[in-house]
């Protein structure tokens, strides 16, 4: 199945800041997004309040996304302490 990706405004703002502050992490996230398109079910599903969402860790940062049909909705990218 081919997936489309939608980015939330919050995620786009986070990436814009990250591009200026940490180019290496920015590039890691871009690479992982390309992998995500091919196999979004591979990543860990969340539970409780965040049931229905999945996560990808990048060091101390967490990317949270949701799969809806053939669309992957990227919700947020934030420090682990602020994500949950």
Task: Locate each region found by the language model.
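Residue-level signal for pocket-adjacent positions within structured domains
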Residues: 13, 31, 41, 45, ...
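A short, surface-exposed loop/turn module that caps and links secondary-structure elements
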Residues: 31-56
